[in-house]
Amino acid sequence: TQAESSAASDVYKRQEIWRTRNQGIGIELKELNLYIYGLVDDVWINTKNDKLIIADYKATSKKGDVTIDAPWQISYKRQIEIYQWLFRQNGFDVDDMSYFVYCNGIKDSKVFDNCLNFEVKILPYKANDSWVTPALKEIKNCLNSDELPEESDRCDYCAYNRKIKLFG
């Protein structure tokens, strides 16, 4: 229909802004005095319900199947959930289903010929952005606190501070 075509055209026009550094898609949270923004790789339209679908592109070169199930890939999932949250905060109707477009470099090609070949896999992920707002409030409380947060073994800054104390 004409309306669907117009919506798709609008999304297409905005894509470049959503991908551009220092623009992207963002929102100012006045009550927290924070500005949150991100640069989204791609936005698709679900033609069955006209909701936006967030797609994120990943590249690697490893043997075996690519997945999004490794413990460290929670950061990928959080990233896409923040993108969904940003679009919803900006008034867009966003599908819970998102996709990772994973490009895995093929290592066992017979010849290079100045060409990299990839196996491309599209991995669906049903995202849940309900944690984002509470996490931002927690972050703001931490920033406003007079006390430092507890150290974590997973924190690079904490590891750096521990090493500095050794020489201190």
What is each model feature region?
Residues 1-8, 12:
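Single conserved hydrophobic/aromatic residue that forms the stacking wall/gate
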Residues 5, 31-37:
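A short catalytic or substrate-binding loop motif that flags glycine-/basic-rich loops and adjacent residues
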Residues 10, 14-17, 32-34:
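Short N-terminal edge-element motif at the start of the domain
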Residues 19-28:
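Short Pro/Gly-enriched beta-strand edge/turn motifs at strand-loop
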Residues 36-67, 82-83:
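Conserved catalytic cores of phosphodiester-cleaving nucleases, focusing on short active-site segments
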Residues 62-74, 120-125:
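Short histidine-centered catalytic/ligand-binding loop motif
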Residues 76-87:
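An active-site-proximal "capping" alpha-helix that borders the catalytic cofactor pocket
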Residues 85-168:
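Metal-dependent nuclease catalytic regions and adjoining charged, substrate-binding loops involved
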